Curated annotation (Swiss-Prot):
Signal peptide: 1-22
Family listed: Belongs to the bacterial solute-binding protein 9 family.
Keyword Cell inner membrane: no
Name under which the protein is recorded: Zinc-binding protein TroA
Protein's organism: Treponema pallidum (strain Nichols)
GO biological process, one term: zinc ion transport
Alphabetized UniProt keyword annotations: Ion transport, Metal-binding, Periplasm, Signal, Transport, Zinc, Zinc transport
InterPro entries given in the database record: AdhesinB (IPR006129), Bact_metal-bind_prot9 (IPR050492), Lipoprotein_PsaA-like (IPR006128), ZnuA-like (IPR006127)
Name of the coding gene: troA
Keyword Signal: yes
Pfam families (alphabetical): ZnuA (PF01297)
PANTHER family cross-referenced by the UniProt entry: HIGH-AFFINITY ZINC UPTAKE SYSTEM PROTEIN ZNUA-RELATED, METAL-BINDING PROTEIN HI_0362-RELATED
Length: 308
């Protein structure tokens, strides 16, 4: 069923490609600005900071959307078919959109921004080649942001000077953010730096900032937690007497709530420490609707709950 939906999208895309080549996306925009289409919000936020008003931007995946399970809609295919530049994370994050990106590559600029990260700095996995959640290490995410910047310069070479100035200013924000996360993390004793979440998305966070991390589900939310997984993690939490576990904005809360109940059945009371933004940012117009705000919210929430 899933494959049929993807193939239908690819077929529609083939028809769309001919249409957009005939008319051109720039002709569709009265101001002549190119269209940039992104997948996850963290990439869209980088485009906003670097390109600002020099492009039209369409982000396909909004707040609360799980990119592991996301399938391109007919509307998405139309946006992608009209795009001058497509930016996605890669590393098998947007698994169900792979055929669509492959179809479009060659007819326009299509960039997997996190596949520019050196292989030596990626986390290897058993069930997939690499962990795609690179944005949890702010310094590592800077590689992806640089790929966004370089792609925008290719798209609009006449704007390179402006893009460079904005990119450098944004990179300074990221450097300050990384330093802030490190300070906050170090404010917790080492034995308190244990993070339990709905799925195993925080591996890069663990490596960069000195946390032990456990996820109820695997790296991809397409994998389901078994009863054995639930009981094993509940035993770990009770044994370590952890004060808090965390829900995620893009994943239903029921599994973490069931985990809390399983821990309490073992005689240890654990709290839901708050909601973290993992695979999607917060609502537009809020601090958490930006990458800097999302990361700041996460570390503040984690430290406050684990310090109890």
């Amino acid at each position: 069923m899933i494959r049929e939906r993807i193939c239908a999208c690819v077929l529609a895309l083939g028809m769309l490609t001919g249409f957009t080549h005939a008319f051109g996306s720039k002709d569709a925009a009265a101001d002549g600005k190119p269209l940039v289409v992104t997948t996850i919000g963290m990439i869209a936020d980088a485009v906003k900071n670097i390109a600002q008003g020099d492009v039209h931007l369409k982000g396909l995946m909004g707040p609360g959307v799980d990119p592991h399970l996301y399938t391109a809609t007919a509307g998405d295919v139309e946006w992608l078919g009209n795009a001058d530049l497509i930016l996605y994370n890669g590393l098998h994050l947007e698994t169900k959109m792979g055929e669509v990106f492959s179809k479009l590559r060659g007819s326009r600029l299509v960039v997997a921004v996190s596949e520019t990260i050196p292989v030596s700095q990626r986390l290897s996995l058993e069930e997939a080649e690499f962990d795609p959640h690179v944005w949890f290490d702010v310094k590592l995410w800077s590689y992806s942001v640089k790929a966004v910047y370089e792609s925008l310069c290719k798209l609009l070479p006449g704007k390179t000077r402006e893009f460079t100035q904005r990119y450098q200013a944004y990179q300074q924000q990221l450097d300050k953010l990384d330093a802030y996360v490190r300070r906050k993390a170090q404010s917790l004793p080492a034995e308190r730096r244990v993070l339990v979440t709905a799925h195993d998305a925080f591996g890069y966070f663990s490596r960069a900032y000195g946390f032990e991390v456990k996820g109820l589900q695997g790296v991809s939310t397409a994998s389901e937690a078994s009863a054995h997984d639930m009981q094993e993690l509940a035993a770990f939490i009770a044994q370590r007497k952890l004060p808090a576990i965390f829900i995620e904005s893009s994943i239903p809360h029921k599994n973490v709530e069931a985990l809390r109940d399983a821990v309490q059945a073992r005689g240890h009371v654990v709290q839901i420490g708050g909601e973290l933004f993992s695979d999607a940012m917060g609502d537009a117009g809020t601090s958490e609707g930006t990458y800097v705000g999302m990361v700041t919210h996460n570390i503040d929430t984690i430290v406050a709950a684990l310090a109890r």
